[in-house]
C-alpha cells in the first residue's frame, strides 16, 4: 500500500470481507512463524504494526489490534512479546488489550508519558528519533541523555530507536548511542566508558 495506507483503508471500509480474510491468513502465517522462532530458541518476539497510527480509534481494534492479540494468545506464556504499533500511542486501551508484555513507541510522544498512560504496568521500548543517527555523535549523546533523564526513576525501559535505522545512519552515531546507554546510570550521569574504542 502507499505511505498513507489509502488502499488498505479503502479495502477495510469498501471490501471488509476481503480485508479480514487477508488479515486472517497473514495472522495464521505469523503465528506459525512465531512458533517456529520460539522452537528455535528466541528469547522474545516483537510484533510490528506499521499502520495502526493511520487507523481511527474506532477502526484500530478490528483493523489491526485484534490480529496482534491472536498472535499474543497463540504465544501464550512461553516468552515475552513486544508490541510496536507505529503512531498508536493514543490508543492506549486497545494497546493494553492486545496482551503484550512490552510496548514500543515511536518518537512522536515522550516515552515517559507513554509509560504513564499505560499505567506503569508494562515495560516500554523506544524512542530516539531515527533521524538523529544521521547527525553527529554529540547530538545523539545529548538526545539520548534527554530521553533517559526525562524517563527518570521509572522502571522498565528498553532503549531503542523510535523506528528503524535509515540508510544514511552513521556508524559513529550508533556507537555513540550504545556507549551513552551502557555508561548511563539512574543517578542521571555518565560513568566512565566501558566500551572498546
Regions picked out by a protein language model, each given a short descriptive name:
Residues 1-197:
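Active-site loop segments of alpha/beta catalytic cores
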Amino acid at each position: 500500500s502507499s505511505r498513507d495506507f489509502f488502499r488498505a483503508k479503502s479495502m477495510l471500509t469498501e471490501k471488509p470481507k476481503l480485508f479480514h480474510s487477508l488479515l486472517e491468513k497473514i495472522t495464521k502465517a505469523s503465528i506459525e512463524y512465531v512458533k517456529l522462532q520460539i522452537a528455535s530458541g528466541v528469547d522474545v518476539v516483537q510484533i510490528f504494526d506499521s499502520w495502526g497510527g493511520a487507523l481511527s480509534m474506532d477502526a484500530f481494534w478490528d483493523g489491526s489490534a485484534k490480529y496482534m492479540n491472536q498472535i499474543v494468545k497463540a504465544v501464550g506464556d512461553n516468552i515475552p512479546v513486544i508490541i510496536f504499533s507505529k503512531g498508536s500511542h493514543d490508543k492506549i486501551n486497545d494497546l493494553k488489550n492486545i496482551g503484550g508484555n512490552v510496548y514500543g513507541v515511536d518518537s512522536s510522544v515522550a516515552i515517559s508519558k507513554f509509560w504513564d498512560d499505560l499505567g506503569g504496568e508494562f515495560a516500554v521500548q523506544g524512542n530516539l528519533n531515527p533521524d538523529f543517527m544521521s547527525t553527529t555523535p554529540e547530538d545523539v549523546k545529548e538526545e539520548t541523555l534527554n530521553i533517559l533523564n526525562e524517563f527518570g526513576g521509572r522502571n522498565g525501559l528498553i532503549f531503542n530507536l523510535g523506528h528503524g535505522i535509515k540508510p544514511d545512519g552513521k556508524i559513529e552515531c550508533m556507537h555513540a548511542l550504545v556507549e551513552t546507554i551502557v555508561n548511563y546510570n539512574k543517578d542521571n550521569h555518565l560513568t566512565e566508558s566501558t566500551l572498546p574504542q
